[in-house]
Amino acid sequence: MSKKKILLLSDDLRMYSGIATQSKEFVMGTIHKYDWVQIGGAVNHPEAGKIMDMSEAVKNDYKVNDAYLKIYPTSGYGNPESLRQIMEIEKPDAIMHFTDPRFWIWLYNMEHELRQNTPIIYYNIWDDIPDPLYNTHFYRSSDMLMSISKQTYGINKRILSKYNYEDWQLDYVPHGITDKRIFKIKDKGDTKFKEFEQKYKLDQHKFKILYLNRNIRRKSPGDVALAYKHMMDKLTPKQREECVFVFHSAPSDENGTDMRAVCQTLLPDYPVIFTHDHGGHMNDEEMNFLYNSCDVYINMASNEGFGLGSCEALHAGTPIVVNVTGGLQDQCGFKNEKGEYLTAEDYVELQSNHRGTYTNHGEWVKPVFPTNLSLAGSPLTPYIFDDRCSFEDAGEALLEWYKIGAKERKRCGELGRQFVLNEGKMTAKHMSESFIKNIDATFENWKPREKYTLEVV
């Protein structure tokens, strides 16, 4: 029996954005089941207008003899004309799109035309409440919505419950990490690992705090630096010699700040490693080395859809400090009064745990609850909460991780690793299995839109 073909609209899966890496994970994890075509977006894509047939490479790398993968690179995220042309050539059985809905308004304007013959699937996320009712028509333009966070699942279900969406049309499918990229290194005496630590001066410190996020305002890089300072201020001079703040991001970004200036001015006496000074971009092996070398990962983002960095850190067995917002909540292992992990269904009523409704959490995380919820917005997204936690609270969390020592951090990190591998279902295998389940459910249950009838009056 021939395989169904899926047309994916997202970042080019050969790129390095979070959208791209996750696109690659679920495409490669399901390519034995489906044929894939991608309209691969990028800013000023260098291969725009070409057709890249990746089938043979996938057959060799993934040992799938009937693999089919073609990428149509494009600058931006495509347009109606190119979509119609590619659909005429490839004749896909379903369309899947992935990333912020505002990039797909042109697609939603075509939804009735497309859904007469082809179902639309949306792998979606939203950073925070209140429920974005301004997204209602975007959500209604899809036949199946897979939610990347439990908070997003609650949003999708509350909004779409008014429009007779059935259970099969909504599901919680968190991002998944493959152990081919990120895993716990058991032998840290390995020569390559040691050489990596020496190259980045990581071998000179015993307690390394990792910031691995974009240098943009909502990621709060300055607050992370102040949290580090808060911790260091409470240590003795001897203890401070063991510690370092590792900044793996662009040191300066117009969408964020100049972190060199921040650190030189506000914490001039405390060591900071800017990884870009020692080599810049890292490949998959080096990224895994970085996660394994550091002792704690921190994310204080005020809005965070999922938080790939903290999830990858847990896969390496590295404990975390995170702001309780968006998808970061799902990595905390919050439990209810019965000691049961919160489910996606719980979030239909809960909405968000950013107010600390539940405080029982996994040992692998020091969650920092927001001290201020500010209503932000823009003309296209009129309202969304901005969850700000204090750098003092985050600094206290870092201090706790320092004080418990390396042996206890290792134990807690391993508990976190087991959580994301099992109950959290944040592996590439779990994600791919969920994709297959939901795509098959779409093909089984989808009903085409009725065609328009034009009558002469």
Indicate residue ranges for each PLM-predicted region.
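Aromatic "clamp/platform" in nucleotide-sugar-dependent glycosyltransferases that forms part
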Residues: 302
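Conserved donor-binding/catalytic core segment of Leloir-type glycosyltransferases
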Residues: 8, 202-219, 228, 245
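Nucleotide-activated donor-binding/catalytic signature segment of Leloir-type glycosyltransferases, i.e.
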Residues: 256-285, 289
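C-terminal amphipathic helix plus adjacent low-complexity
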Residues: 359-457
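Short hydrophobic beta-strand element within catalytic cores of glycosyltransferases
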Residues: 319-322, 339-346
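A short, active-site helix/loop in glycosyltransferases that binds the activated sugar's phosphate group
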Residues: 132-170, 177-187
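Extended catalytic core of nucleotide-activated donor transferases of GT-like folds
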Residues: 8, 52-144, 150-151
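N-terminal subdomain of nucleotide-sugar transferases
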Residues: 1-56, 90, 457
